[in-house]
Every structure is written in C-alpha cells, then in structure tokens.
Amino acid sequence: MKHRLFTLLFLQLVSLALFAGTVTTYPAPSGAPLNDDFTVRVRATGGLWQTVDTYAWNVDHTNNGRHTIEKSSVAYFDFTDKVEVEVTWNKGDVKTARVRPLSKNIATTLHGNTVCFSLDRPLDLSVEVNGDTYHNLQLYANAATPVYKNAGQVAKALGMKKKDVLFYGPGYYDLGNDSIRVGSNQVLYVAGGAYIKGFASVWQASHAKVIGHGIVNPERQHEGIMVRYSTDVMVDGPITTQIPVGGSERVSVRNAKVISWYGWGDGMNVFASNDVSYNHVFCRTSDDCSTIYCTRKDYHGGCHNISVTDAVYWADVAHPIMIGLHGDIERNEVIEQVVYDDIDILQQREKQIDYQGCIAINNGDNITVRNMTFRNIRIDDIDEGMLFNFRVCYNRKYCHAPGGGIHDITLENISYNGSHANLSLLTGYNEQRTLSGIHFKNLRINGQRIHDKMPGKPGWYKTSDFARIFIGEHAENVTFE
C-alpha cells in the first residue's frame, strides 16, 4: 500500500513538473539606463520568485503646447502557462492601483505598496499607481521563444548561413554614429538582455528579419528600426522608439513595442506600402501611434491591404490612428483595404482641434480613402480629443490640394467609456469630394448602444446627436445600427 501511494505521489510530482509553466528573465546589462521607481518580481505558479530589471524610458508630457520629458519604467520577461507578478512602488504610499488595458480584466490585490496579479497569456500592460500615467511601468509579458546563444544557433534554427546572422547577445552596445544595416536574406537577432544604443535599418532588402526581445534605443530623436524600400520583411519582438515602413511590400510586424518622447515621434508609420500587417503591438508615442500615408518622405504611391490586429495605442500627443493627409496630387492615390481589429486606445491628449480624433481620417492631396473596417476597438477616457475625425479637407499646412473622398467605412463594436471626449466630426469637402457610406454598428458610449431605432430617441433628433457626432456638409449615407 505504501509503495502504491509513493508511486502515485511520484507520478503526480512528475506530472506537475512536466506541465508547470516557465519564466525567463533577462538581467539588464551594465551601461543601460535603469529606473528604481518599481521593483518587479515574477514566478511561475508555485515556483521561485525572480527579479525583473526595470529600464528608464522617457515619455512626453504636454501642457498647452509645451513638452516636458518624464521618466517612466519599462520591464519585460517571457513565460509559458501562467505567471504571478508583484510590482512594488518604491517612491511612496500606494493608495490606488490599476493595470491597463482595462479590457483585459486583470484582477489586482494590493499588499502595502505591492500590486499583485496573475497572467495566463502574453500581454502588454501599463501598471499605474495613484493615477500617475507618466511615471508608470510598461510591463511586457512575452510568450516564450527560443533563446539563442550565438549566431550559429540562429542560423541552424532558421535554415540560413551563419554569415547572414547579425547577432547581438545579452550586453550593452553603443553604436556611436554608426547604425546596423540589415540586407537581403539577413537576420538581426537582438537577444533578451541586449541593449543597443543606436538604430537599425532594413534598407533595399528582401527576405530580411529583425527578431528577439531585446532593446534598440537611439536615446535621441530617431527611428529605432526602419523598413525602407524592402520586400518580405519580418520584425518580431523588439522594444524600440519607432518602426516606420516606407516604400515596401509584404512586411510583418509583430510582438513589437515602441515608446517615443520627442517631436515627430510617430510610432508605426506606413508610407506608400502594400501588404503590411501588425499583430500584438504596443505604441506609446509623442505623435501619432499608427498612420497610413501615401507619397511622403521620398516614398511614392498609395497603400492597400494594411491590417492591424491586437494593438495597444497610447497617444501622449496627436492621434492613436491617423489615415490620409499626405500624397502626390498628380497621382490621385488611393488608400484601401484597411482593417483595424481588437485595439485598445488608452489615451489621446491633443489640444489642437485639427489633430484630434482617436480614429482619424483627414483626407488631403487628392487621395481617395475607401473600403476600411474598424472593429472591436475599446477607448478609455481620454484627456483631450475626439472619438472620430473623418474629414475630406484641405490642410494648407501639410497638403497641396483637398482630399478626393472618403467612402465605405465600417465601424463595428466601438466602445468609449468616459466624459472628456469632444464633439466628433464627419464632413465632406464639396459635391465632388464627398464623405459617404460611413456605417456604425454597435457603437456604445458609456454602455449605451447608439442606433437609429434606439428607445427614447425623439423622431426629430439625429442618431448622431446621442454620440456627439457632428455630420456636416457633403456627408452622405451615415448609418447607425
């Protein structure tokens, strides 16, 4: 009997060991800028606690056009299955704490100055104490991926030549005035625990990759990772400042995080590119988080087949989503076949009315914007801005002609919870340059569904009045279902 019980206990322990989760942390290298505002610890369920180093990362705090740099924190780790997290605030008493996006429903408990919670899936989170969003912790809980110790292991795993692997293992690298150029059939591997002070560029390349969970930070006003005039490119895993894609085709960006703090700090631009996809990305930016533009910065042409899935957008300035505006007035360019799905918008803080809009299509330079879907988008209470800014317009500061038109835009399952959003705008330009076919489906404002047959709506009211949306001239076929 004792032998049987021992056997059963042994098998149970083996089973627990086989199916227990794992946690991988990466010590910060000497020379990397750190922040001691928080102490972060993680462990697999029932495992040993591990400390996660926290980096200092600048963010932009605007007030009436003035910009102040604040120092926030960034930490990251990899895991499988489930993980327990402890975040301790070291700078004072914690009265309140929250973990965003709120839609992820992360239940927290507070023990003194320590916020405790559990995760069962990869998430990009903001841990905020006492309502402070400028000295918060950006916490990136990554899905575990293979950890390579040298270029040979990368080459073997990816079926390529060792000479085509640009390997940056754990450590601190100061590129000075130099940069990393990734060419055709090459892979830049930035390991967890690597910190590159500088930037990288995929330039005139095909079949190139930038992978790994490390950091690429110019520590100045500059794009961290650029994809330019290239085809068949993948960016997977890094933390950086900006990832613009220009004049390129078939580009995949996934599990990437960007934070900027300087002027023109757009997060993930698309310029004159086709077949570009983003999946599981995080953008906290000092300008637009996500943009789609036509001709701009020596990139020429329209854009089609752009998709964004599972993103967190936090615009300390300008727009979370901005489409249109820039093009070549002689080409009559088109932006089409665009999908944004499963998006959390945590902030917009923009004083200028022209540049407000959590979802903005400001169409200029004879561009036609058409056939777009915005689906499953959740907007937190913003500081200052509007929900929707769809205008065929002539912005003389940036454009050389009005836009050509905005047509066939579907917005499905969009929700906003808050009280600070300004009046939204939907307008055309003239009888030839119209806004048409704008279809809202299950739009919810503070839980109330806004639709044409909503109960209690007086017959002489416009449905848009209940969403605080102004529908102006040359706007046709705007519906609410």
Q: Whereabouts are the PLM-identified features?
A:
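Bacterial N-terminal signal peptides that target proteins for export
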Residues: M1-L9
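Extracellular "leader-to-stem" segments immediately downstream of a signal peptide or signal-anchor
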Residues: K2, A20-S184, Y195-K209, I215-R220, ...
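Bacterial N-terminal signal peptides
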Residues: L8-A17
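Non-cytosolic beta-sheet module surface loops
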Residues: W89, L119, V281-F282, V312, ...
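Extracellular beta-strand-rich solenoid/capping regions of secreted or surface-exposed proteins
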Residues: F117-L119, Y173-V187, Y195-I211, N217-M234, ...
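Right-handed parallel beta-helix
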Residues: N185-V187, G192, S206-N217, T231-T241, ...
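Extracellular beta-strand/beta-solenoid scaffold signature
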Residues: E219-M226, T240-Q242, Y262-N269, T285-Y299, ...
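Extracellular beta-rich repeat passengers
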Residues: R349-E481
